[in-house]
Every structure is written in C-alpha cells, then in structure tokens.
C-alpha cells in the first residue's frame, strides 16, 4: 500500500490524512525529518507560510525536504504549501524550498474575511471542482516546464511540474477527494516506475 505523508508542523493536517485515506492510500503525519524515509509522497498543507518556514527551520526540515523533492518522490503543496514549494515569491528574495518553477503572490485574493469558494475547471478532473480559497496565494508566472492545471478569473491557481503539484486552494476542506486522488495517482505512477 502507498504511504503518503503530510508535514505535521501546522495547518489542516487531519483533513489531508482523511482525504488520503478516502483515496485508498495510507496517511502518515510527518513530525520529524527521518520519517520522510517511510513515505512514497508528501503533502505540504495550508497554514501560514511564514510560521511554517520558521517551524521547518526549527525542526531542521529544510535540507531533508529539498532532498526528498530532488529524489523525484512526488510533493503536493496546497495554499501555504504552494508558497513553500515555489522558486520565487513576489516582493521578496527569500524563497523556501525553491523547487517548483513558479512565482507566487501571497494573500492575492485578500484577507481572511475575503475567503471564498469557486467552481474550478481542473485539467485531468471531470466536471467542476470546488476550490476553497482562504487568504490564498496565486501563481503570477509559471516556467516553461510547468503545466497550468487551473485558473480562476485569469489567475493561475493550480500547476504541475514533473512530480511537483501545487494549488492555491484547500482541496482537503471539501468531501470531493479528486485533487488528492490526482496526487495519489502521481505517487502510484512514480513508485511503479521506480521499481522497473
């Protein structure tokens, strides 16, 4: 059985575990860097990116997370997790993991009072997907190797590059598990190809 980890430092960790399990994989909360060896794929959940970065540094996760992504194992960043994955963050020179070739803008849809839901067309999913946006970032620019999966009002809100997946919204906060399933399928494919 596939095991997908959720970085358990902050954010909607339980909700991601529930969604992973609904897709038929095992979910594991990752609290320590050495636990990354036990998983086939990793979700970086939403939360607050500055706080998450501080916790990543405190618990010495930065290098192990970069090595995990460099190994080719799939990583999915949602909301703040997208910011953590991004190569560039608008208005600052301080990227985090810097592995997904995008430039993101934080809180680009407004403050928490401006949180909203929107029906999205997501490449690879049949029918609309309800995106829950909470102080969400969006992708300002995507590199040549980045596939745009979804836009909302002309703003990129989901993208994929190799085994990296990122979205501005919180797919774990709905009962529609198709975004998580998309990631589970990426992990399955990677694990299959790694064995060959």
Swiss-Prot record:
The lineage of its organism: Bacteria, Bacillati, Bacillota, Bacilli, Bacillales. It comes from the Bacteria. GO terms for molecular function: glutaminase activity; pyridoxal 5'-phosphate synthase (glutamine hydrolysing) activity. Belongs to the glutaminase PdxT/SNO family. Gene3D superfamilies: 3.40.50.880. In the presence of PdxS, forms a dodecamer of heterodimers. Only shows activity in the heterodimer. It catalyses: aldehydo-D-ribose 5-phosphate + D-glyceraldehyde 3-phosphate + L-glutamine = pyridoxal 5'-phosphate + L-glutamate + phosphate + 3 H2O + H(+); L-glutamine + H2O = L-glutamate + NH4(+). Pathway: Cofactor biosynthesis; pyridoxal 5'-phosphate biosynthesis. This is Pyridoxal 5'-phosphate synthase subunit PdxT. Catalyzes the hydrolysis of glutamine to glutamate and ammonia as part of the biosynthesis of pyridoxal 5'-phosphate. The resulting ammonia molecule is channeled to the active site of PdxS. It comes from Bacillus licheniformis (strain ATCC 14580 / DSM 13 / JCM 2505 / CCUG 7422 / NBRC 12200 / NCIMB 9375 / NCTC 10341 / NRRL NRS-1264 / Gibson 46). Its EC number is 4.3.3.6, 3.5.1.2. The active site is at 79 (nucleophile), 170 (charge relay system), 172 (charge relay system). One of its GO terms (biological process) is glutamine catabolic process. One of its GO terms (cellular component) is cytosol. Keywords: Glutamine amidotransferase, Hydrolase, Lyase, Pyridoxal phosphate. L-glutamine binds at residues 47-49, 106, 134-135.
């Amino acid at each position: 059985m596939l095991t997908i980890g959720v970085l358990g430092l902050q954010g909607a960790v339980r909700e991601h575990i529930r969604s992973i399990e609904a897709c038929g994989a095992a979910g594991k909360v990752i609290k320590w860097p050495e636990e990354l060896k036990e998983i086939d794929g990793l979700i970086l959940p939403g939360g607050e990116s500055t706080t998450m970065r501080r916790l990543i540094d405190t618990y010495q996760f930065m290098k192990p997370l970069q090595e995990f992504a460099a190994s080719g194992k799939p990583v999915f960043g949602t909301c703040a997790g997208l910011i953590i994955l991004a190569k560039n963050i608008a208005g600052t020179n301080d990227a985090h993991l810097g592995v997904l070739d995008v430039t993101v803008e934080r809180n680009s849809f407004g403050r928490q009072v401006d949180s909203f839901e929107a029906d999205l067309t997501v490449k690879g999913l049949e029918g609309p997907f309800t995106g829950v946006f909470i102080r969400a970032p969006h992708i300002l620019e995507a590199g040549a190797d980045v596939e745009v999966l979804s836009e909302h009002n002309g703003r990129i809100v989901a993208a994929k590059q190799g085994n990296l997946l990122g979205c501005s919204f919180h797919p774990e906060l709905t009962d529609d598990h198709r975004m998580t399933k998309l990631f589970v399928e990426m992990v399955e494919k990677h694990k299959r190809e790694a064995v060959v």
